[in-house]
Amino acid sequence: MTSEFGSPSESLQAAAEDWMTSAGRLRVYRAGQGPALLLLHSINAVASSAEVRPLFEALQRHRTVYAFDLPGFGRSDRSDRPYTVSLMCAAIQDVGERIRAQHDAAALDAMALSLTCEFLARAVTQQPSAWGHLTLVSPTGFQGAHPRTGSPGSTAEVPGMLKLLHWGGLGRRAFSALTRPSVIRYFLRRTFGREQIDEQLWRDGVQAAQAPGAHWAPLYFLSGALFSKDSLDVYRQLQHPVWMSHGVRGDFTDYRQAQAVLQLPQWSLSVYDTGAIPYFEDGARFIQDMCEFLATPGSVGHQR
């Protein structure tokens, strides 16, 4: 399918492969040499690995950098199936296992953006010895006046919402409305907290919305099914070095519950005078800070 923006393209300009996993076919990107580093994009209507482009391009000078389009996004499998927290975690686990097999089974450092921080944290708690330093950028789960609580594995899915979105093509129409070029620009301005946005990221989003089956996974995002009620408990379980960062502009600035983890010795925090994706605006500083964090000694049980 084509438009004035061209046909859907690769999320990143790098060597790309399709890996078959328990979560389906995943498009995986790789570049550079050195210790492995996995970069994970966020979840939204037009998400893809394009969201980690500045880090992927800069860090490949020092690391073997991997990124992949999560199930239902980018160039990965976008079929009509349930998109769940467990599916996202399985994708992270499977890709992580294959990366480690190519790097002498070394613990894998990883970075995640926004909601995907919850998936990464859960995957790490399921197999702690497989993971190393964790970089969480604008993580969800810390907002609100009261801690988000729930039984293990519970989600914030709105009862009946998925059924409604799958009824009579309603979800497809909602997706089409939310992914018009002008609407994508509107949401990016809210993410950046200003009029100026990254124009390439906008173009990538417009293209991502055109892929066949692009609406299926976002329906589960809209229903709340991908948000975990027990995310704060999952974050608390992490024994790895964790560097959390966020900005001060836009819609993603509420971290009132973060003290629950920031009081733990293995957690650290950086706040940038940016929107929700600091490395798109203050890339040099962010990358320097991230490299310094990744260079610190650490393993399971490490305390900074």
Give residue ranges: language-model regions.
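N-terminal cap/lid segment of alpha/beta-hydrolase-fold proteins
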Residues: F5-R25
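Conserved alpha/beta-hydrolase catalytic His-Asp/Glu region
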Residues: R173-R236
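Active-site loop/oxyanion-hole signature of alpha/beta-hydrolase fold enzymes
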Residues: R53, A67-L115, Q288
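Flexible "cap/lid" loop of the alpha/beta hydrolase fold
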Residues: T125, W131-L170
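Hydrolases whose catalytic domains are alpha/beta-hydrolase-1, hotdog thioesterase
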Residues: F119-A123
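Conserved loop-alpha-helix segment in the C-terminal half of the alpha/beta-hydrolase fold
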Residues: Q237-T274
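Catalytic histidine-centered segment of alpha/beta-hydrolase-like enzymes
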Residues: T274-I287
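Conserved HGGG/HGGXW glycine-rich cap/lid loop of the alpha/beta-hydrolase fold
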Residues: R27-R75
